């Protein structure tokens, strides 16, 4: 079986610390208690101090220690490759606005990005065609049904409703301006690489595993075509979508990709603008509505951060204007969200008082 490469990482440490609330890092700015000059969502961000970074390191270490032994959930088994990924893997990473990544656990293990890719192809379409196309052709509402539901299409006259479910994601892929299939894939791959500031590999074993079992998505693609919601060849869009879900990504990569959204569309490492700042809130709104599938409302109620999950075990969350966090562990709950990743992100967000709906 083909293995994802494990990439080298800078200094990493081990885990453990007591639970306590210190920093107020969220709606009042990154680490506001320690850095009172920082203000508000989306404002200019100061460089974290060494003390701030030590505190973040303590938090990711403790979160890893707290939740590494949680045994709930199981790997996705409808995609054979995902069922074979070691269930004990668990990584957490925070990306700061000055380009540092603070991490614990298996953060260099490359896993399948799966549905998290939907966010970044949506960003590409917005960059090419503007945000209005999302409301006009994709939708901005939750389906109220599982992410791969055909019933949702039937109930809404083949309208995909959201770019963050499978139907809407394939429609999103079909909106990428491309001369041919090769150009189509190159644009999507280059866009992902830009958000990660890394060359993200297509894992052929995952791609084959998904292609051999994606009859359901092919049916959805044809339904979209029937309803005039597919804007390129239906099977080309389905195949490109399958490929983007098969990209290998590490927890570090995912934190940086989310950090680009937290940083107003500018990659915190490369300094390159990947998305107009005015479009970022629209992306985050989609994540809030449908980012964790049919438990998205519960996540917003409990945690209060825009987030996106994938059945490969990854979840990213964004504190707008401040920081981002990513976590990975393969065992999923019934909705398709990583159990350990949810616990880790929710606990760290609570420690940092990061709920964007709170004062």
Give residue spans per PLM region.
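A short, well-structured edge-of-sheet supersecondary motif
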Residues: 68-104, 316-317
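Short Gly/Pro-enriched turn/cap motifs at secondary-structure boundaries
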Residues: 82-85, 160-162, 212, 304-308, ...
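Structured C-terminal helix/loop/strand segments within mature extracytoplasmic catalytic/sensor domains
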Residues: 48-49, 263-359
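Penicillin-binding protein/beta-lactamase superfamily catalytic region
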Residues: 182, 211-214, 222-282, 333-338
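Active-site-adjacent helix/loop patches that line small-molecule binding or acyl-intermediate pockets
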Residues: 48-66, 70-72, 125-244
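Active-site SXXK
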Residues: 99, 111-135, 257, 325
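N-terminal secretory signal peptides
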Residues: 1-21, 28-37
């Amino acid at each position: 079986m083909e293995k994802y490469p494990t990439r080298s990482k800078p200094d990493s440490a081990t885990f453990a610390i007591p639970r306590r609330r210190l920093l107020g890092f969220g709606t009042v700015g990154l680490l506001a208690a320690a850095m009172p000059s920082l203000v508000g969502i989306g404002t200019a961000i100061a460089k974290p101090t060494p003390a701030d970074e030590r505190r973040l390191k303590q938090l990711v270490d403790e979160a890893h220690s707290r939740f590494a032994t949680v045994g709930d959930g199981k790997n996705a088994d409808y995609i054979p490759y995902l069922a074979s990924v070691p269930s004990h893997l668990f990584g957490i990473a925070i990306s700061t606005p000055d380009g540092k990544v603070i991490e614990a656990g298996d953060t260099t293990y490359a896993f399948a990005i799966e549905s998290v890719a939907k966010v970044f192809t949506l960003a590409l379409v917005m960059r090419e065609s503007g945000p209005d196309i999302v409301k006009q052709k994709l939708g901005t509402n939750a389906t109220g049904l599982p992410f791969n539901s055909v019933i949702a299409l039937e109930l809404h006259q083949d309208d995909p409703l959201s770019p963050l479910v499978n139907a809407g994601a394939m429609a999103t892929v079909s909106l990428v301006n491309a001369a041919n299939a090769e150009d189509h894939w190159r644009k999507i791959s280059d866009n992902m690489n830009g958000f990660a500031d890394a060359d993200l590999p297509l894992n052929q074993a995952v791609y084959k595993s998904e292609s051999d079992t994606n009859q359901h998505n092919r049916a959805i693609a044809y339904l979209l075509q029937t309803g005039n919601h597919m804007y390129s060849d239906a099977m080309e869009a389905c195949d490109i979508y399958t490929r983007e879900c098969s990209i290998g990504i590490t927890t570090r990569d995912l934190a940086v990709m989310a950090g680009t959204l937290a940083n107003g569309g500018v990659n915190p490492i490369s300094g390159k603008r990947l998305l107009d700042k005015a479009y970022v809130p629209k992306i985050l709104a989609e994540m809030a509505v449908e980012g964790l599938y049919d438990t998205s409302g519960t996540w917003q109620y409990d945690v209060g951060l825009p987030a996106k999950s994938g059945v490969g075990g990854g979840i990213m969350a964004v504190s707008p204007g401040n920081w981002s966090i990513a976590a990975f562990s393969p065992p999923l709950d019934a909705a398709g969200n990583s159990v350990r990743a949810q616990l880790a992100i929710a606990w760290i967000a609570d420690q940092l008082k990061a709920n964007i709906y709170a004062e």
